[in-house]
Amino acid sequence: GSSKAALDSAMKFCALELAPNIRVNSIMPGMINTSLIKNRSAFSSEQLANDIKKYPLGRYGETDDISSGVIFLLSAASKWITGQTLVIDGGRTLL
């Protein structure tokens, strides 16, 4: 939506302004298995089953899926990456 677009623009602006000494990137996660999902108080089993079908990898993400992306962006392996959004969504945005 528009709030994600605004955050993306702000991230890119910061990446340009703070370069070359500071790298700025963002992460756009898909649905993450949290207590909200696990307790199923917010969604019915049918709603969850229908939503999971929208994920090519067949499941919601786990917190370690996101933390792995954070670790990558903080590591030297990403030293030439700035102004980028790392999409970690199990392929959801492909559909």
Per-range role (PLM):
Residues S41-Y55:
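A short C-terminal helix-loop "cap" of Rossmann-like NAD(P)-dependent dehydrogenase/epimerase domains
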Residues Y55-I66:
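A conserved structural motif in NAD(P)-dependent oxidoreductases
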Residues M28-N39:
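Short, flexible catalytic-loop segment of classical short-chain dehydrogenase/reductase
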Residues I66-S67, L73:
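Non-catalytic, hydrophobic alpha-helical segments
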Residues A19-R23, I81-G83:
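Short, small/polar-rich loop/turn modules that mediate ligand/substrate recognition or access, typified
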Residues L16-P20, I32, G61, L74:
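A short hydrophobic alpha-helix cap/turn motif
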Residues I71, T82-L95:
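Short C-terminal tail/terminal secondary-structure segment
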Residues S3, M11:
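Active-site helix of classical SDR
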